[in-house]
Amino acid sequence: MAVTFPPKISPTLMTPDPHFIPGYSGFCPQYRYSLGKTYGQLTSHLLTNPDIRRSGHLVLQSNPFPPAPRGHSYNEASQELGGRRRRQRLGDPKLTISMIPGYTGFIPRSQKFFAKTYAETSWDALSDFHNEQQMQESQRQEMLLTSKLQEGRQPQTEHEKQLLTARHRTPLPALSKEPAPFMSLRGFQPQGSPYYMEEENPNKYFISGYTGYVPRSRFLIGNGYPITTNRAMVEFAHMNQKKGVRFSDQQGHNEGDNLHTEQGQIYLEELGLLPRYTGYVPGYKFQFGNTFGRLTQNALGQSTLQKQTVN
């Protein structure tokens, strides 16, 4: 008895076209309002039902590549974007007009375009990038031509030979290898520290941005920094005059003298160091029970053995 088999393509087993296969993530009209069948049978019924309004194309963008802009063709675009000139300039032949969706590589200037399909966005981005590269190349050629003309390496045309020419070419040769530097007779002359200037001197102030400490400046407000520092130094000088202290007598500073006196000693014998001094003080780690200034007083005048005993 002969055994009969069903045909390989049976309408019972195969879903008739058109239909979508499971996993399709695109839009299907009226799919969210239908149920009771498999995905293939349900989409086949929705796509063939004349009562359901739908598009005439199963895929809205039937052409995988966007239409070329007006005045261009794919042959011209292929020569521009995929031709020899582009590969020599960019060095990457992967960027063509037929960019497939899902490409994870970098496409120059693609972040500037949106609200279009992937192929259209890639087309616009590559066209914009190619135009920018051509502009930069033309600027580079123009700079090379200018350099050749200035150095005399560009051969002259017949028309240029008939023009009036100058006796000298740029750049002009230097007259001396070591020219004498220019010194202005009215140049700025440093006048020394503002602390040692007279009160009537208009330069007795610190410019804005000075981060050093200015005595008495924290108590003056309501004026600009130069005016504040001027008043602070004048007030500080008056306070020292009442105590019998003058900067000019102590430091031996003369107006017009730019040399500052060097202080070779760090540890003063008469005074202690200010708090938060981070340098080394001999014998300080063996002392305790007094202020920092008292413990660091006369650091060089006492030996380590003497400083172990607190006065």
UniProtKB/Swiss-Prot annotation:
One of its GO terms (cellular component) is axonemal microtubule. It is found in: Cytoplasm, Cytoskeleton, Cilium axoneme. Pfam families: CMI2B-like (PF10629). The keyword Cytoplasm applies. Expressed in airway epithelial cells. InterPro entries: CMI2A-C-like_dom. Keywords: Cell projection, Cytoplasm, Cytoskeleton. The keyword Transmembrane helix does not apply. It comes from the Eukaryota. Microtubule inner protein (MIP) part of the dynein-decorated doublet microtubules (DMTs) in cilia axoneme, which is required for motile cilia beating. PANTHER family: CAT EYE SYNDROME CRITICAL REGION PROTEIN 6, PROTEIN FAM166B. This is Ciliary microtubule inner protein 2B. It comes from Xenopus laevis (African clawed frog).
